[in-house]
């Protein structure tokens, strides 16, 4: 659920050297670091099954599932799986519309991509609710989400009927509903600073069998819901087709879908990774999956896919619009940095994340121009100044929700290109 503010430490009194914005006195810092190193030298890593060997990872199949439920954007074979699935979605869409009495060519489509951003996910929640109220919110053929965007995505995919639940998800929670801090000793012997059992319970409460069945029903209409994680062993971004998982109706589908939403939000070292059991041939392995933000803060589909050309191979010519909800600002947040190691590192990481997100927008914009897709972007405006005292600050989230709701309800004027970093010579 990370964003450019993830260098803020939710529990500074417990972990002064963890995710840092303020460093302890030098002597205390040295003492803590020394103790940490001593403890770490005597600690064994948590047990796990072997990772998929290098060179075989593209062939791994999630235990109990079919091969084609996920895509690797840089692997030609897995990209072809996406192309095949997209063509299948066109067949399903055409068949569904024909049953509804539609004749002629397929109608224009809208796609929605929701970025990461931690508790800034309240922006997407408010915007979608306001968009419903305004009256022009489309039904999206494709919805994608990363990190907190992955948590928003199922609600957005299923439409206005789930607006109330989405609002509750992002305006009635606080940090205690997301994670529990661990003791220093537990941190040293475990795989993360925090226990995210509260978030798991929250996802379990909201993503139930009824929701999965509703998602499966949309698969039959040719719609797609995708979320992103990162396979940390292979250093590979992975795109998961939640609609296909739901429509398979296989045992374990619901648990896998929940696990993927948790994995997409699992900030490395802050929240535990999600271990996914896979198989290659008759051998069993385990993949370690973490926050999709590690590779990209927002995505639409593999850049290697020329969507317009793919559709035209089966005679489909249609208008396409892409809407991006960026759960973050575009302008950098100014701050005077203390001349100390940890604040410098924190600000540098924050800056890196900020510009990675902007780079993602440029990548997507380039693809939309190539594939003749209308680009539309919404983001948190620089005028939003509500204090952000801690992660998942309920007051902050409600204020952001209300702002986004108002923006959309009034009829938002979408930004048609990424921020200009180099002034035009024209």
Where are these regions (language model features)?
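Sec-dependent signal peptide recognition
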Residues: 26-33
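C-terminal motif of bacterial Sec signal peptides marking the signal peptidase cleavage site
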Residues: 39-42
């Amino acid at each position: 659920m990370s964003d450019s503010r993830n260098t803020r430490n939710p529990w500074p009194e417990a972990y002064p050297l963890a995710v840092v914005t303020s460093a302890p006195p030098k002597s205390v810092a040295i003492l803590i670091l020394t103790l940490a190193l001593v403890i770490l030298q005597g600690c064994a890593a948590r047990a796990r099954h072997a990772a998929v060997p290098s060179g075989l990872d593209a062939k791994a199949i999630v235990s109990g599932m079919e091969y084609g439920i996920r895509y690797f954007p840089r692997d030609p074979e897995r990209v072809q799986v996406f192309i095949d699935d997209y063509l299948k979605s066109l067949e399903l869409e055409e068949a569904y519309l024909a049953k509804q009495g539609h004749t002629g060519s397929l109608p224009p489509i809208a796609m929605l991509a929701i970025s990461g951003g931690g508790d800034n996910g309240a922006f997407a929640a408010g915007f979608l609710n306001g968009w419903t109220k305004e009256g022009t919110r489309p039904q999206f053929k494709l919805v994608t989400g990363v990190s907190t965007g992955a948590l928003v995505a199922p609600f957005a995919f299923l439409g206005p009927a789930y607006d109330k639940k989405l609002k509750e998800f992002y305006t009635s929670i606080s940090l205690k509903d997301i994670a529990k801090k661990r003791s220093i000793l537990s941190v040293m012997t475990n795989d993360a600073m925090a226990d995210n059992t509260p978030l798991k319970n929250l996802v379990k409460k909201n993503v139930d069998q009824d929701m999965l069945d509703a998602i499966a029903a949309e698969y039959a209409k040719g719609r797609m819901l995708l979320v992103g994680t990162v396979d940390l062993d292979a250093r590979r971004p992975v795109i998961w087709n939640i609609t296909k998982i739901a429509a398979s109706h296989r045992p374990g589908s619901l648990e896998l879908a929940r696990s993927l939403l948790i994995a997409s939000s699992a900030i490395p070292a802050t929240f535990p990774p999600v271990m996914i059991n896979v198989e290659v041939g008759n051998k069993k392995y385990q993949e370690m999956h973490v926050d999709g933000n590690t590779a990209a803060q927002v995505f639409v589909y593999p850049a290697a896919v020329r969507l317009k050309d793919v559709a035209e191979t089966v005679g489909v010519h249609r208008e396409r619009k892409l809407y991006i909800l960026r759960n973050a600002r575009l302008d950098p947040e100014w701050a005077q940095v203390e001349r100390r190691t940890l604040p410098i590192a924190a600000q540098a990481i924050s800056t890196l994340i900020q510009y990675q997100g902007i780079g993602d927008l440029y990548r997507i914009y380039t693809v939309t121009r190539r594939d003749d897709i209308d680009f539309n972007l919404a983001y948190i405006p620089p005028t939003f100044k509500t204090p952000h005292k801690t992660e998942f600050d309920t007051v902050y989230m409600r204020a952001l929700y209300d702002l986004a709701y108002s923006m959309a309800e009034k009829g938002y004027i979408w930004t048609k290109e990424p921020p200009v970093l180099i002034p035009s010579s024209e």
